[in-house]
Amino acid sequence: MPHSTNKELILGIMAGTAGISLLAFWYHKVLKPRTTMNFPKLLSLGKKFGSLTLPEESHSAQGASVVFQRRQLQILEKLNELLTNMEELKEEIRFLKETIPKLEECIQDEFGGKVTVHKISPQHRARKKKGTTVQRSATSNSSEEAESEGGYITANTDTEEQNFPFPKALNTHIEELKLDVLLQKADHLRTNESHKMESFELLCDHKEKFSEETEFLWRLARAYGDMYDLSTSTQEKKHYANIGKTLGERAITRAPMNGHCHLWYAVLCGYVSEFEGLQNKINCGHLFKKHLEIAIQLLPEEPLLYYLKGRYCYTVSRLSWIEKKMAATLFGEIPYSTVHEALHNFLKTEELQPGYSMSNYMYTAKCYVELGEPQEACKFCNLALLLPVVTKEDKDAHKEVKKMISSLKR
């Protein structure tokens, strides 16, 4: 199974059993400029403590405990405010870096009398294609498109500049396919990283005809996840993630015993959580964990599920003291997992599909390093280097494996 859909997923699904480990995601992610965190200030709990009257505060153990908790919350509030401000500043800097070159280009073209030719985003390209092939009325929008218009649809203009692969020239005639033929063709196209967009557009061309078919629905949800993966624009990522999640939910409603529906709904929940506030992140975390476990019960031989669970366990096992303290203070319990549990899932992935992904080998090696088994770690690092570098996830894993090998040789 292609493994590029795993990219960035775990960053959005660290909520854990009670949504707690999503706080860990927040703690790590605030230093990365790609994601904007609009968390509500964690001041409400502090205010509740502040409103308590403690007449015997200095003499009562209970009063001292409340004072201590209040001070803890005040520290967390200040920390949250500081990190949020840092993230907002980094997002503004990133925006300026992207905007200034385009502004310079526009000015040069204006004075030079040139005509600017921009690359077309995949979302605009797909819609333009449909406009030339199928005449649709203004009322024919699907429910997923309507949802995207509620706040997640992007401004589809030719001025958007993207840096990812574009599809080859598209035919102006849509070939009508039977459902089984369509699904086979879409699955086959998706096995090639460079053909994922074509697979997505093929499914979109037939969504009005097969929108009630479960096998079609979960594949279309998966395809929206692929487009999330390919997109570099934050707005487009939001658009694809939200529509995909809606489709995944519809698929589960129609077929609650279909493991693929639960799998890809969980994946899309993780993607959506990238752009949500703290409360919704926790909710997405609940959904991810719940549907991942259901999918494992229904698809016990699916390697992707164990890889995702391994990533989850590995991240939770590495929570720092302050992350655990924050989780306990805010939610009353601490998420728990071990490196051994993570390793078990990564090895299960390898057992089900040898050479599943470079990333799986990389995380297996990391587990062995932490367990004090450098020889096993080297073994899996070397196995990782035997695999081809195809996706961005592969490139990141390859770089990390090289660092690990250098460290193990010391």
Curated annotation (Swiss-Prot):
Residues 121-131 have a biased composition (Basic residues). It is a single-pass membrane protein. The keyword Repressor does not apply. GO terms for cellular component: cytosol; Golgi apparatus; membrane; mitochondrion; mitotic spindle pole; spindle microtubule. It comes from the Eukaryota. The chain crosses the membrane at residues 9-28. The keyword Cytoplasm applies. Keywords: Coiled coil, Cytoplasm, Cytoskeleton, Membrane, Microtubule, Phosphoprotein, Transmembrane, Transmembrane helix. The modification Phosphothreonine is found at T139, T154, T157. Signal peptide: none annotated. Disulfide bonds: none annotated. Its main location: membrane. Residues 120-151 are annotated as: Disordered. Interacts with microtubules. This is Regulator of microtubule dynamics protein 2. It comes from Mus musculus (Mouse).
